[in-house]
């Protein structure tokens, strides 16, 4: 009876929370794209807003990388209704129906619903009106011609601050028929992958390297039964010129449905790509697809939620919106990017001097910085988003061979060497690696004061994988080679370096000498950094690899003003006179054992010493 009462109480609380889940509603239109509302599903994101009576949205699809590794938007879409219900409307309402995963806009008897299919890359726009109205549909593209990459614009791609003179973004192709528009970006034969491979001395193994940019085509098709192509025109939005392909209703109607199907794939020809797109189109069934998408979103919210009233209501709101945007990339082949995910908007509304295209995002599109990516993915363990973590795990798994080839070519030993700022093809970002390097520099090491020897961040994702087994009893067998290779790198590489310095590859206690190394990006030329040791100890213990664990040094301690605490690095007798030589980019590396690798990394360190560590 007690168990039954608890069950009833749980069901009641669950019902109340579900019932209390609010829609996020606006009662006035927006001024520009910075006031847009997220909408999406699967691996598709839309920024939706109403401006001067027009319904607009950007479309982003995960994996749409161009030749320079910019993550491209698929275009901007504009819907203009006549007579216009949204101009000077007294009953304007725009809602993110978060529980069902769609956006609804209404005024003066007109309702527009936008939703993305969770299980296939298809967007639906459904327009309902009490009276017959006309509709204009604009497909707007700013890549209608080759675009010279301007000052600061390199931050959106892998060149960053070192954009070669004359570098362009190649134009898109746009093909119009009577009632449809086909649009796509096709990467040229040479991409940033080829440039990076040559820069980093890997041309002899180029054909063995995973290359996600080769023959990549991204785009889609928009169509509707009641549309007919009208004309093109040019304009400027948010400081960026564009060309619009404009369709109009054949006749006024009370109901209009517009569909956009997307496709991103590596195809040797445009015809093969279009075949893949048409396969998706052939599977569309709007009624059943919508039901299945709503079922998915309902289950997504029912399995995990935070709902708080009172002073913390804003915290609850922000958490829910952030989680919704994470859910929009749940079925992606690529991780949700830390710098905006699928939902960036025109940069001029962040910084008025950045009159750059909607494709712009600082910190790149195809460059993944591990210390930032981890912040997106660690919390998913607590919220039970194990399926959402898969794209991040698969990201590293796909890059494993490339990381292992780096070790084999540069140092002739085994193990996966993953950089901190990692390209989507598994090599260090070329600008961080260094365009102007002395001939004597080790080709496997970034010539970079912040990132040299910063190799331990991949271990955080290894531990995330291991934690999914602890949290969810997940089958992680496919990732075991990745994890084992990541830890084996440190064993192989630091024995290799020790033998370059002298006869012995271990210290007097039979431990690895982790020098030169880096305690996060902060303490450079460190010996036995706390962050790396904690990572190795935690992962090896979770993995059950005691044979390698015994070679890992203890987490270093130091005493300051009579108080013992965790040290960034260890002071031992090696060729470096102290445990560190320089300090860069301030991060609390000594807190990594406290906060990130909490299960095993500092089990033998007393609580008082942990508390003294700042």
Question: Language-model segments: which ranges?
Answer:
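Bacterial Sec-dependent N-terminal signal peptides
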Residues: 1-20
């Amino acid at each position: 009876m007690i168990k039954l009462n608890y069950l009833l109480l749980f069901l009641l609380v669950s019902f109340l929370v579900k019932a209390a889940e609010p829609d996020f509603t606006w009662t006035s239109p927006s001024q520009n794209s910075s006031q847009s509302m997220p909408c999406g599903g699967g691996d598709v994101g839309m920024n939706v807003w109403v401006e001067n009576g027009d319904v607009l949205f950007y479309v982003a699809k995960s994996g749409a990388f161009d030749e320079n590794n910019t993550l491209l938007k698929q275009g901007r879409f504009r819907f203009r209704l006549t007579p216009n219900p949204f101009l000077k409307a007294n009953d304007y309402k725009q809602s993110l129906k978060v529980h069902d995963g769609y956006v609804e806009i209404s005024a003066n008897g007109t309702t527009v619903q936008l939703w993305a299919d969770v299980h296939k890359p298809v967007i639906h726009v459904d327009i309902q009106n009490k009276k017959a109205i006309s509709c204009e549909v604009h497909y707007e593209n700013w890549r209608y011609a080759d675009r010279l990459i301007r000052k600061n614009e390199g931050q959106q791609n892998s060149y960053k601050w070192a954009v070669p003179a004359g570098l362009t973004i190649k134009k898109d192709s746009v093909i119009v028929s009577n009632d449809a528009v086909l649009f796509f970006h096709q990467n040229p034969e040479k991409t940033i992958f080829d440039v990076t491979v040559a820069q980093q001395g890997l041309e002899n193994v180029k054909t063995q390297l995973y290359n996600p940019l080769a023959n990549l085509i991204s785009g889609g098709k928009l169509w509707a039964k009641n549309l007919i192509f009208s004309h093109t025109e040019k304009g400027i939005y948010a400081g960026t010129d564009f060309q619009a392909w404009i369709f109009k209703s054949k006749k006024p109607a009370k109901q209009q449905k517009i569909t956009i199907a997307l496709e991103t794939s590596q195809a040797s020809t445009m015809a093969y790509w279009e075949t893949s797109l048409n396969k998706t189109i052939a599977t569309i069934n709007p009624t059943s697809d919508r039901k299945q998408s709503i079922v998915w979103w309902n289950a997504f919210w029912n399995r995990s939620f935070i709902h708080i009233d009172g002073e913390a209501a804003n915290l609850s709101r922000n958490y829910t919106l952030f989680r919704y945007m994470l859910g929009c990339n749940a079925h992606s082949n690529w991780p949700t990017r830390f710098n905006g995910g699928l939902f960036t908007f025109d940069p001029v509304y962040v910084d008025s001097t950045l009159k750059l295209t909607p494709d712009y995002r600082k910190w790149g599109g195809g460059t993944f910085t591990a210390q930032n990516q981890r912040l997106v993915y660690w919390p998913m363990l607590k919220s039970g988003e194990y399926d959402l973590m898969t794209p991040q795990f698969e990201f590293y798994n796909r890059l494993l061979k490339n990381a292992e080839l780096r070790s084999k070519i540069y140092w002739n030993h085994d193990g996966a060497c993953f950089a901190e700022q990692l390209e989507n093809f598994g090599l260090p970002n070329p600008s961080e690696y260094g365009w102007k390097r002395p001939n004597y520099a080790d080709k496997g090491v970034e010539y970079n004061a912040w990132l040299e020897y910063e190799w331990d961040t991949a271990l955080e994702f290894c531990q995330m994988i291991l934690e999914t087994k602890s949290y969810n009893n997940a089958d992680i067998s496919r990732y075991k080679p990745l994890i084992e290779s990541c830890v084996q790198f440190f064993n192989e590489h630091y024995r290799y370096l020790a033998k370059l310095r002298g006869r012995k590859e271990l210290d007097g206690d039979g431990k690895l000498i982790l020098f030169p190394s880096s305690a996060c990006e902060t303490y450079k030329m460190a010996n036995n950094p706390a962050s790396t040791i904690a990572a190795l100890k935690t992962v090896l213990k979770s993995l059950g690899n005691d044979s390698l664990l015994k070679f890992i040094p203890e987490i270093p301690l130091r005493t300051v003003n009579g108080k013992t605490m965790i040290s960034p690095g260890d002071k031992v007798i090696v060729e470096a006179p102290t445990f560190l030589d320089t300090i860069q980019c301030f991060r609390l590396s000594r807190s990594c054992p406290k906060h990130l690798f909490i299960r095993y990394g500092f089990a033998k360190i007393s609580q008082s010493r942990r508390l003294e560590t700042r």
